[in-house]
Regions:
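N-terminal leader/linker segments that precede catalytic domains of diphosphate-processing enzymes
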Residues: 1-168, 173, 178-257
Length: 257
């Protein structure tokens, strides 16, 4: 308890950190150590991709309020007290673009703590990759602090983003979100040979040809055959049926385990 006599030759800090019980330490810590430390605000931001007609699309919002009013931003927001980052992602995706997001489709990407990244004050963001099927396009609607939901094309060969055919530049984005998008491209391309989560960009059921088309889009020029695809990702997918195409052989259908 606070006010307990400290043995001679020992500092109060040493006593409570080393010799007291954890309950006594925490009581002392919250009274003695917390006030001098400033605390950052913590946000989550999501690089939310989908794969539509052979192109990678990125869900962004156009901010309706300061800071960076009218700029494009990743879906995200401040974490609530008592929630972890993944559940904050689920909540923000629901609030901002009206989508239900399963936890398995959320992948932590990078923590960004660059001083001055947010003009409102000290803010740390935990950025995530989010994989959405193309049917998500039919469900999105703007909410919360989003003026509108914007879908941009992302060229994984050049790293460039396009809106209505116009190339976007760094100043079009809020905060440091342009750099976070670039980091997401690098992460996906580095991990594609051993991490099958990118396959969540496909529909629930898909063919090997669908998977090959996605690999080629994410890693342009990368050579991948049907046999190699099944060798790499066979442990993560299961065969669920087949379909017949006129004048062609039967094609197997798969889904992620």
């Amino acid at each position: 308890m606070i006010g307990q006599k400290i043995p001679a030759g020992m500092t109060e800090k040493e006593y409570f950190e080393v010799h007291a019980s954890q309950e006594e330490f925490l009581e002392w810590y919250h009274q003695q150590e917390l006030p001098p430390y400033e605390k950052p605000s913590v946000t989550v931001d999501m690089v939310a991709y989908c794969f539509v007609e052979g192109k990678i699309k990125l869900f962004l919002i156009r901010r309706k309020a300061h800071p960076f009013q009218n700029c494009l931003a990743l879906v995200g927001g401040f974490m609530d007290k008592g929630e972890d980052a993944a559940h904050a992602c689920q909540r923000e995706v629901k609030e901002e673009i009206n989508l239900e997001l399963p936890l398995e489709k959320i992948e932590q990407l990078v923590t960004v703590s660059t001083p001055g990244r947010d003009p409102r004050g000290w803010t740390v963001t935990i950025a995530h990759l989010v994989y959405l099927p193309s049917r998500a396009l039919e469900l999105v609607q703007a909410g919360d602090d989003a003026k509108e939901v914007v879908l941009v094309d992302v060229d994984f060969h050049t790293g460039k983003c396009y809106l209505d055919g116009k190339e976007l530049v760094e100043k079009d984005f809020a905060f440091d979100h342009a750099a976070i998008i670039q980091e997401s491209i690098r992460k996906i391309q580095e991990a594609i040979d051993y991490d099958p989560r990118f396959l969540y960009l496909l529909e629930d059921e898909f063919t090997v040809d669908d998977g090959l088309a996605l690999v080629e889009t994410l890693c342009p020029g990368k050579s991948c055959t049907s046999d190699r695809f099944l060798s790499k990702y066979g442990h993560s997918i299961e065969e669920v049926g087949f379909k017949r195409i006129p004048q062609k052989e039967v094609i197997n259908i798969y889904r992620l385990n």
